[in-house]
Amino acid sequence: MKKRMTALLLSACMCAGLAGCGTNTPGNNPGHTKTDSSVTSLTDNITVTSVKTDITSFDQLKNGINEFSMNMYSALPADENIFYSSYSISSALSMLDVGANGATKKELENALGITDLDEWNAEMKTYLSKDWSQNTFVNTANSVWMNKDTSWSADIEKDFLTPAKDYYSGEVYEADFNGQPDKVVQNVNNWVSTNTNKMIPEILKEIPGGTVMMLINAVYFEGKWDTPFTEDKTFQSSFYGTDKESVVDMMHLYGEHFTYMDNGEIKGITLPYDGDNVVMKVFMPTADDGDINELFDKLSNEEKQKLIDSLDNANNVEIDTLQLPKFTDEQSIDGLDEILQNMGIRSAYSDSADFSKIADGIAVSSVNHRAKVIVDENGTKAAAETDIMVKETAMMPSEETYNFIVDKPFVYVIEDQSTGMILFMGRVNSL
């Protein structure tokens, strides 16, 4: 049995609810995003009886997201710059999983690394409410956009919208996809821009044909270096990319101490941000003529993770000269679908997709991802968004000193060391 969305609205209007919002962070709380009259927010009308979670470990979330990150890395082109947030993609897919059943749900959870769904959702919810410092923080926001002319499951509020709000702080909007598509596009773009601090101002130019629902995750990270670079020590120098040599702005630090490792093939360094245990880890070949792509790509997922983790127990040494390029990288992946299907998420795209907690006869049409990073003397700003389009189906200390000169291709991750979770991962082949 299905009811029109107006029935949900009527039911929702009789409920007193909690406000849905993005993660609270100092000086940057997205909260409810302003929309115009063409969009109706249902968030406050969805009642959540929140149960306090007693989470002391984020092991399942960390293991799942980090494994997903390694799979993404291997699936993306090896000869290009890449930058993405597995945390963002996993968050969006996890919200989709709330509405899934049967084989569709099993495939999503296998790909995400979910072994205990209740624990996974509790870890997600707890991480979303994490307190951050003024200088280093992560903002996460989720939203559900529903076409007002679509018939939804009679129990969509109980089965999907309420847990999406409870576990993922999901904001819920009803909009006229068919009658006012341009205004819907404007509101969606405004929501993403607001929740990425304007780093990603636009994700849509039009609503893809047949779309009845959009699930969107937005992540914004800002971190100030614990040991900042200074502009007077930034000067132009060569970066020897895979395809060309280019002259770029290189930042320098001299005689500072950092955690450093070298296994004979790959060397790495940890660059901490101020407070909250978030760090950037950078990896390069040890040999001057080494190739980070060849060395890193030959490692299994487990070996990649061990390499990243090895910096946690490495020595803190004096780095005689640290040289890091000042750079901006922006990546857009319009269509993660083949990658996700290769990870085992197949039925979600087919006529046999089971999202019956949302509606019968709907399937995923596309999953898209955009990410941007800015690295400068003060620190790092990074943002990412993941959007899932749902359509109707045919159915419906050391004495030794070291140098770390980043003047050739490198791999880097932004990691929350309090959980061990990789928030962003990237590779720079050329600048």
Question: PLM features: residue spans?
Answer:
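Non-catalytic, conformational "gating/processing" segments within enzyme and secreted inhibitor domains
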Residues: 33-38, 79-80, 117, 121-286, ...
